[in-house]
Amino acid sequence: RDLAMTVQYFLEHPDYTADFFEKKIQSVWAEPTFQSLWIQEVKGPGWLFPSFTRSLFREGGWANEIYWELCNALQSLIYGGALLFVIFKRGRVRFEGLIFAVIFIGGFLFHLFWEAKGQYTVCYFLMLLPYAWSGFGGWIAWVNEQLGDRAKGRKA
């Protein structure tokens, strides 16, 4: 009954629905640490931890900031590489080469409509690693091809 009421509310309020799903996707798929520090939140005597650990767990701590930036760069590289895969390898991959993509898309859709936390979705994110690697390989091959064509044009 609650589900039916929620669906009805979403249907009657499309702006709210779009905002809800936008925020949900951002909090789950664009948070670069996948809540790895949030789930480590310390309840109790945090002063017992070494200063590095406190700095890592505390939002705004120097170690926390470094960790977040490194995770953000890595996440951006993986998403970017997966996009390059779509651009450069489109139509040249056998079906069995897409199994991780199917799992990722299935996980994305499942958590779009079900409970979601970054810590639940990191396993799907990791499915993008082979595509990111291949995507960067496709991009490098394309760049080399472009440079080779320019070099040939200068020699002629």
Regions found by a protein language model. Give the residues of each.
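Membrane-proximal low-complexity regions enriched in glycine and acidic/polar residues
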Residues: 1-23
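Hydrophobic/aromatic-rich transmembrane helices and adjacent perimembrane loops
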Residues: 73-74, 117-137
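Membrane-interface junctions at the ends of membrane-embedded or membrane-associated helices
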Residues: 87-95, 132-156
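Transmembrane-helix signature of polytopic, lipid-linked glycan biosynthesis machinery
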Residues: 85-89, 103-118
